[in-house]
Amino acid sequence: MTENRPLVHFTVCPKDCFGSCSLEVEVGKGKITKVRGNRNSPVNQGRICVKGMNYPNMVYGPERLLYPLQKIGKRGEGEFKRISWEQALDLIYKKLKNLREQYGPESVLYYNRFANLGVVKNCAYSFWYQFGGFTSTYGGLCDSAAQEAINLTYGEVKHNRISDLENSKLIILWGSNPAYTNIHIMHHINKAVDKGAKLLTIDIRENESGTKSNLYLNPRPGTDGCLALGIANQLIENNIIDDNFIDRHTFGFSEFKELVKNYPLEKVSATTEIPLPKIKSIINYIKENPRYALICGMGVQRYTNAGQTVRAISLLSALTGSIGKKGCGFYFSDRQAPELNWPFSPPKPERIRNSIPVAKLASGMDNQIDPPIKAMWIEQANPMTSNSNINLLARVMNKLELIVVADLFLTDTARMADIILPAASMYEYLDLITGYGHSYIQLQQKMIDPPGECKHESEMYRLLGKKFGFNLDYLPENSLDTIEKIIRNSNLNTEIDESKEKPYLHPSYQEIAFGDLKFNTPTQKIEFFSQRVKDRWGKNPLPVYNEPVENKYTSPNIYSKYPLSLITSHAHNKMNSQFSDISILKEEPFIWINPHDAKTRGINDGEKVKVYNERGDLVLKAILTEKVSPGIVHTYFGWWNGVHHANLNKLTGEYISDIGYGTAFHNCLVEIQKVK
């Protein structure tokens, strides 16, 4: 009987998520039979999300791509035929070689995002460097605006160990919905609330995390920076600040103090459309508990004013001295883990063109650049779902001579490909994972062989590299020996066998972030006034508030036709666009609309509605709810056009943040009408 019992292996989820959960995986007869949280993990302590529970459905589901495919018919129609790996690689080799000779290596756009975290995906650069160059993108879809803003202000992006939230007396969630996007931090929030902590929620809607909130504030979309400056004004005016901390550990306070005088409560209330008594209430809560934890989410930094907004919000923690102490602090992400080094990198070629911002991928590719983009290699990404203005992106991609996509599924992006290469799942290759919700480094173990003819990208590049005659020493096999070399090259004080059993935490890790009160800024202090903001980004060194684009004040002509602000947030059953096609997790696409807005348009609950603007349109099911204010419609991001016939990025514009080259998805006006 013992021989038939499944073996239990430990691994880590590599998805682009705060969790980076440690997993216990049962494997029997070469197949995964069950996935659960590792009960001995210091982070998730046995907890995993609904997506993690459904990993076997992803690995073995009928949607999985198993063989190389070649397009037949027109691009985008999703019609393919099965071909061999030799045929696929030969077609790719000949076309890439021809394009390199005719236009130069920069004619190939290599596009890679963060479907999986980890270090071994750097094998791609070992190939493209030997190719002689390529075109790449810069900026981000997710958090680049906030990361840059916090680095400019504090010198590092880090926060206390999440369990320290249980010591908090006051917790403020600002544009954050951890019940859906960070269940481990939510666990500790709930424990703090059960012990008597007050919970305040600031969001454009009533989210799933705020069910126990003592106070809800719903600002007009994009006005969070104004609200933060108004709160700062009141904290200073009412002396709810830590003068000693400010004097010793901050720079530019006097200039900041003058700035916030321009944000009296009446003006802030009018701008944010938050009733004055509610703003006064949050001041009173902070007065009662000036040492508080402020958890800032991704949502506030998806506007064109994102960087200055995050700077303003983060500085509220500095005003009351809520930095470097237990039970308080500013939480965005925790980047204390040391960088993992890829020791197999060939010399970097000169002909790398880093010229296209991710936020403007479509128009950036469409611009008259020399040489023009003629081919696109896409892995770990689904831009036809995840990037803005996908109708334009589709038109641009249709002009390309070659599109290669490596993926597990027939995504909207894969449907655009000439050649699809079937990729390995996280259980089918080795990797080292660092996350951003905690600072542990964990070994991702290989537990099963890839099904069909699926391969990890390292093997794809190795096979293609052979055809080009590249040095394969720079394209190592995915093996324990490769992982050991990465560990040694990264100066980690651990061994492979040890990593199989437990996560690694670097000795420099701070359980209480900034507990030493050292800040890696030019002034060695927290910077209210940051000269680098002006030098790098050409923006005001102080975190001033500017109205974002595409709203009723900055775009009255657009607003007159499309008067509803569309906000898209992340769901509990999808990871960006991943898991959208898994049958058990599928849902009918919907949109929240306030009953007042619905009534004026003759829309009833559950009816089909057309959501549209000048960029595109789609049909969703209307859900009438008071959880969104009039003038706002809300839904969750990640539906595929090929599966759900509903891709929200048909509607979004190519807007970029003030700082950090972030993508401003939330600057999006739409109109809604009943489908007859």
Enumerate the predicted regions with their spans.
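Extended redox/cofactor-interaction regions of prokaryotic respiratory oxidoreductases
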Residues: N122-N190, K195-I202, S209, G225-L229, ...
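Acidic/polar loop patches that form or flank catalytic/metal-binding clefts of enzymes
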Residues: T33, S136, D242-D243, I279, ...
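N-terminal export/assembly segments and adjacent metallocofactor-ligating motifs
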Residues: M1-N238, K267, P275, I369, ...
